[in-house]
A protein has these predicted regions:
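Transmembrane-helix motifs of polytopic, lipid-linked glycan transferases
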Residues: 119-139, 177, 181
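Transmembrane-helix signature of polytopic, membrane-embedded enzymes
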Residues: 29-33, 115, 130-154, 173, ...
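Short acidic/glycine- and proline-prone juxtamembrane loop motifs at membrane-interface regions
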Residues: 157-170, 340-341
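Transmembrane alpha-helical segments
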Residues: 358-360, 368-394, 414, 432-438
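Specific aromatic-rich, kink-prone transmembrane helix
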Residues: 65-66, 129-131, 151, 170-187, ...
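Membrane-interface transmembrane helices that cradle and orient dolichyl/undecaprenyl
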Residues: 137-143, 176-194, 204, 305-312, ...
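Aromatic/acidic, Gly/Pro-rich catalytic loop(s) in extracytoplasmic/lumenal soluble domains
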Residues: 463-553
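Transmembrane-lumen/periplasm boundary regions of multi-pass, lipid-linked membrane glycan transferases
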Residues: 58-71, 203-206, 212-318, 328-330, ...
């Protein structure tokens, strides 16, 4: 006969085991999402082989912020200008600054490397997965919600930009969490959720400006969910007012330094006419490439089921939220002159939600969620295995060569398209923080971001260019072969380098899997004794209509 105490102990053991099982079920989705983030990091470029030209700039911006905090200079503006003169690929004020705060923190722990920068992006990629899981969980089962997270994380475009040091994924993560808090406010009517939504959406804005489109679908969802009660809810008015005030610094930064971003919203030469059919079909035609056929097909089925009233959980304001989020995003990004597949990503999380909810509600109970999970896992596995990230290889090797070849406090002239790759490569060399890079295009040309926005030439003669290089005390010239040879100034620079004052010291081929024009570089060394006569340098900054100048190292 079993004693009462033994039976009680056995029952407590069963209850404890059941409690641990429930905890494991709750934690399992988060563990799976973390594993997905780890798989993405493991398949990311990590050795200085940035493919997208802006990626090393975003990495350098984080290094700048880390160095600024470490230095705590008495004159931060002068210090920042001096930093730009040494590492002239900075773009920190041209973008919102929030991502760089996190990146600088990771750099402080792991060191300034591409791995640390990429790990920061993957952190947000993982948080994006958490966010879409929590959002979908409001309307679907736990397996289906995890399936939605894996579907979104496995979308080819999302996985691609999750493996580049860019702002798109961090902005999406903040946005999804902000919309999740907003949805909780509508569902549970708690003021703290509304305040949290405003804070998270402001964080998205301070990561990337183009998330601002979400205000329109959120307002329409609010009206659909609350009707005239919106006008009498003081919490809404206080929150909107506080959010508007919180957005003012971001607006100021955009207007002061973000003219290029504003130009992207205007018509640029070579872009599709804004109101043409080809412009408005640009993103729909690319949806299979951006989203992938499995998720796209399931999302279409989910939309049909939603319209037919077959997904009761999404009836009412959730329908307004999900459809408005995607439709308004599509309209917004189509209206912007510069159209790239990655821009539309911010509007695509509802497709994963619809796909998962369709399976969860249309298939037999419990089966649908498991099918959604299987689809999500399969999509992510396929993308990671068969959608490799493009790379450009060779710039880190050139930076290492330069670091090993120049004397203390050396000055290096760089002439090429991917200056960010080279400059960040030098910044990762903590043992050579004394080297200054000077960009030839900043000396000889006047160009804002890219050539199609207009190019001005300094009109120096060949002799003047040679004298400029000599007076600056350039120790090495890193020159992309045949770089912008259609411009007179660049042809004159090439002629100077092929003359008697310089000799080739090394040659590097640029490899990788991304199509590019930068095929090879030649590194030149002066044949004369180098003397640093010029102590100061002033550069035009047409991107914001000003100048940056100061003492050279």
């Amino acid at each position: 006969m079993v004693s009462p105490s033994a039976a009680d102990a056995g029952w407590r053991g069963v209850k404890s085991a059941m409690g641990w099982l429930r905890l494991a079920r709750r934690l399992a989705p988060y563990v799976a999402i973390v594993a997905a983030g780890g798989a993405l990091l493991a398949t990311s470029p990590l050795g200085g082989d940035f493919a997208w030209s802006d990626a090393p700039r975003h990495a350098l911006n984080g290094a700048f912020l880390k160095d600024l905090i470490a230095a705590m200079p008495r004159h931060p503006v002068a210090w920042a200008e001096s930093y730009y003169l040494q590492y002239p690929s900075l773009s920190i004020l041209f973008y919102p600054p929030l991502f760089y705060v996190f990146e600088a923190t990771v750099f402080a722990v792991l060191g300034v490397t591409q791995f640390a920068a990429q790990a920061t992006v993957v952190l947000f990629y993982t948080l994006l997965g958490f966010g879409i899981y929590r959002l979908t969980r409001l309307w679907a089962s736990r397996p289906a919600a995890l399936g939605a997270a894996l579907m979104l994380m496995g979308m080819p475009e999302v996985a691609l930009w999750g493996r580049q040091v860019m702002l798109d994924i961090p902005a999406m993560a903040w946005l999804v969490w902000g919309i999740y808090a907003f949805a909780r406010f509508l569902k549970f009517d708690r003021g703290r959720d509304l305040a949290l939504a405003a804070a998270l959406l402001l964080a998205a804005l301070y990561t990337k400006y183009n998330v601002a489109f979400v205000v329109v679908p959120l307002m329409s969802t609010l009206i659909a969910g609350r009707g005239r009660l919106v006008l009498r809810d003081r919490r809404l008015w206080w929150t909107v007012g506080a959010a508007a005030i919180g957005a003012l610094p971001a607006i100021g930064l955009l207007l002061t330094f973000g003219s290029a971003n504003l130009q992207s919203a205007a018509d640029l030469s070579g872009e599709l006419p804004r109101w043409s059919l080809v412009a408005w079909s640009f993103y729909p035609a690319l949806l299979p490439q951006i989203v992938g056929w499995p998720v796209l097909g399931l999302a279409a089925a989910g939309l049909v089921a939603l319209i037919a009233g077959r997904i009761p959980a999404l009836k009412g304001w959730p329908t307004w939220l999900l459809i408005g989020w995607t439709v308004i995003g599509y309209v917004f990004f189509t209206a912007i002159a510069v159209r790239e597949p990655r821009h539309l990503m911010t509007a695509l999380p509802p497709l994963a939600v619809l796909a998962a909810c369709a399976l969860d509600r249309l298939l037999p109970r419990r089966t649908g969620g498991l099918v959604a999970l299987a689809v999500g896992a399969g999509v992510l596995a396929w993308t990671v295995a068969y959608e490799p990230v493009p790379t450009v290889i060779g710039y880190k090797q050139m930076a290492d060569y330069v670091a090993e070849s120049v004397p203390a406090n050396a000055r290096v002239l760089f002439s090429g398209y991917r200056d960010g790759n080279f400059v960040f490569g030098l910044r990762t060399r903590e043992d050579r923080r004394d080297i200054t890079t000077i960009r030839a295009d900043k000396l000889l040309l006047r160009i804002a971001i890219e050539r199609r926005r207009g190019v001005g030439e300094a009109d120096y003669s060949q002799a003047q260019i040679a004298a400029l290089i000599r007076n600056l005390g350039i120790d090495l010239i890193v020159a992309q072969d045949s770089f912008w040879a259609d411009l007179a100034e660049m042809r004159r620079l090439a002629a100077v380098l092929s003359g008697p004052d310089f000799a080739p010291a090394a040659h590097f081929s640029i490899g990788g899997t991304m199509g590019r024009t930068d095929k090879s570089f030649t590194i030149y060394r002066p044949n004369y004794p180098v003397e640093q006569k010029s102590r100061t340098l002033e550069l035009d900054m047409p991107i914001f209509g000003g100048k940056i100048g100061g003492q050279l190292r």
